[in-house]
Amino acid sequence: MSELISHRPSVEKDLKKAVGGIITDWSIGAGFRVQTDKVAAGRTTDHTFDYVAIDTSNVIAVNILAPGSGGLARAQRYGFQSLDLETTREGRWKKLAILSRPDDWSYDARALVKKFAQSVVDFHNPQSDRDTVQLSLEELRRAA
């Protein structure tokens, strides 16, 4: 049963690997170390960030969000994660949401994600969006 619950389609795994490569490449020059699948304890449940980039004064939490059917349910889960972690150390981390298949996200779902992430990136493919992801990470690093 746990295999079914934790199942991620191959496309999502490929996307996560591609984004991970982009984040790792950026982190080397920026002086960050990267952790994968970082678990954070919320008030009601545990949550997992796909990537967390850490340096001496910053933590940037990255979630790769797939829209499913219009994205609203996924956006609501992302919002719940933010609210559940709000009073924790992890709740103070800077948040980057990467939206896969950006054309499939409804306006309401996209707006909800933007309420909880400091930066949102539309991700079409690794070649065209590499610079956008790295620029967003850099902007979050520099933000006070």
Please tell me what each predicted stretch does:
Residues 39, 64-68, 98-102:
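Structural motif
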Residues 94-96:
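Hydrophobic/aromatic residues located in beta-strands of well-ordered beta-sheets
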Residues 45-48:
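A short, glycine/Asx- and small/polar-enriched loop/turn
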Residues 2-37, 144:
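Acidic-basic catalytic patches of nuclease active cores, encompassing PD-(D/E)XK
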